[in-house]
């Protein structure tokens, strides 16, 4: 598994949690080269959070070559915070500033009827930590919303 780091203070914690599940993972910069990732048998990718906004001029973005590589290999993706916004931004969704920043504990609610394997073993509602100022206004075509929080600005 590869974790692409967009500057989150929690990227190492994400990697540790994945390893605690006995899954081998490596932490890479979000600017990793296609050649470096292609040299590994990547089974899944997590895109971390980060302090930027995807629509800012100098925001970090994964290269198109990486997206092509992952699509060719049919690699599942999980975007967390900025990582989710990066996926939406790249694949035709809409990300914009929220009405106000969100910071602190929040409850995630699984979408009723969702049988995504990524949430397998988790309760219908669980606590998470959030820190962001942007909002996903439109999900990209072909993507599926599997959870939400009740704090939406």
Question: Where does each model-flagged region fall?
Answer:
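Hydrophobic anchor at the start of a short beta-strand
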Residues: 1, 25, 77
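Short, charged N-terminal beta->alpha structural module
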Residues: 1-21
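Short beta-strand segments
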Residues: 3, 130-131
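Cofactor-binding loop segments of dinucleotide-utilizing enzymes, especially the Rossmann-like FAD-
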Residues: 4-6, 30, 82
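Conserved Rossmann-like nucleotide-cofactor binding loop
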Residues: 9, 33, 85
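Cysteine-nucleophile active-site neighborhood
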Residues: 16-22, 38-121, 126-127, 133, ...
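A short, well-structured beta->alpha microelement
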Residues: 22-38
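Short, Gly/Ser/Thr-enriched beta-strand-loop segments that form substrate-interacting elements
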Residues: 142-150
């Amino acid at each position: 598994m590869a974790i692409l780091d967009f500057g989150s203070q929690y990227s190492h914690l994400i990697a540790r949690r994945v390893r605690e599940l006995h899954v081998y993972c490596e932490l890479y910069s979000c600017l990793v080269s296609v050649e470096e990732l292609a040299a590994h048998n990547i089974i899944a990718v997590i895109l971390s959070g980060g302090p930027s906004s995807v629509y800012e001029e100098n925001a970090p973005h994964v290269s198109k070559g990486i997206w092509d590589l992952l699509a060719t290999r049919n690699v599942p993706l999980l975007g967390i915070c900025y990582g989710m916004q990066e996926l939406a931004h790249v694949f035709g969704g809409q990300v914009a500033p929220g009405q106000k920043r969100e910071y602190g504990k929040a409850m995630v609610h699984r979408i009723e009827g969702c049988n995504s394997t990524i949430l397998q073993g988790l309760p219908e509602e669980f606590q998470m930590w959030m820190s962001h100022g942007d909002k996903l206004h439109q999900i990209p075509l072909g993507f599926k919303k599997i959870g939400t929080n009740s704090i939406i600005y």
